[in-house]
Amino acid sequence: MKILILSCNTGEGHNSCAKALQIAMQRRGINCEIQDTLALVSEGLSQRVGDAYLFSTRGSLFEFVYKFGGFVSSNMDTWQSLVYGANRLYAKKLFDYIKKHHFDIIVCVHLFPAEAITALKRNMQLDIPSYFIMTDYTCIPFLQETDLDYYIIPHEHLIEEFAEKGLPREKIVPIGIPIDEKKFSTRLPKPKARTQIIQTISNSNLCSEGNWYLVMSGSMGFGNVEQLIAQLLQDIRPEDTIICVCGRNESLLHSLQGQFAEQHQLCLIGFTNQVSILMDAADVVFTKPGGITSTEAIVKNIPLIHTHPIPGLENHNAHFFHHHGMSYFTTDVQHQVAIAKRLCEDTHYRKRMLHNQCANANPHSSDDVINLILENTPQPTNY
């Protein structure tokens, strides 16, 4: 059996989901490959789409595009969207790639390849099993115009939303978002995790005592990070520590270094692969409400505060988590810091949030996705 996971270069979340699934598959001896779908056309196209996505998330542009897409999507009848039409353009190249490498199963973690696979099923008789994994806690615009075999969604309480948007109920499977189980379903003891972080980060004045506040702005570095850090520095105790992960946003990193150069309670980090250990070391996590990072946090079972979302999908994520008691969501930085301090000081309040996280998280989501695939796998297709 050979599985192709199709992602897209729009933020790190989709790729993280794909990598987590690949790790779980390889652990079980399954031949699996991840492909940036648009890179099949050209690396330049993939880069341009990634840059366009990054630009669109600034200000209110993404919110407008998302709402407009939702309006168009909800008013479609028999005609297909421009999104479908655009992804049909490279579908033949994708078909040739699938045929050349003899893949038996397709898993899409992004809408674009799901649209392309739909076109191949309709126009080129692609007849191998196909799966879609939703990496946010809501149904995205245009998903209902795709035609894959199964749609794996983050939570059972979202079934009605996806069905109401037009997805066949029998195809909806509420397993959860795949995460790296080995990293996030286990925890290092806090002192050991802090020791590792202190040893890893050079030129830092990290103190192993006190409360550690972990501020994460996503792989691209979003959110009102400057205001949050300023408020934390004003309100926390002298023995407490702030660790801020700026992702790949170098301008944010340099700006914070300039603004807070004399603040020894603050440690600034760029892009890192040590998120799991940072969560082990922290007492509270502040993060924008991306679907992947939020899922990793509740599987890790750490107090979680959702900060400024990218308008659109992340608003839905934040409200879903807040409604289920898995996080606290507010865009007011004073309130964010006040809640963070309460989570550190109020044992009952903290335990209630952690209990809600355990009740709603699936640490075995990657393996459960694989089990679903294996249960529904026919004999390999002969091209």
Question: What kind of region is each of these model predictions?
Answer:
Residues E12, C17, F71-L167, K171-I175, ...:
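Active-site and donor-binding regions of nucleotide-sugar-utilizing enzymes
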Residues N362-Y383:
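C-terminal alpha-helical cap of glycosyltransferases
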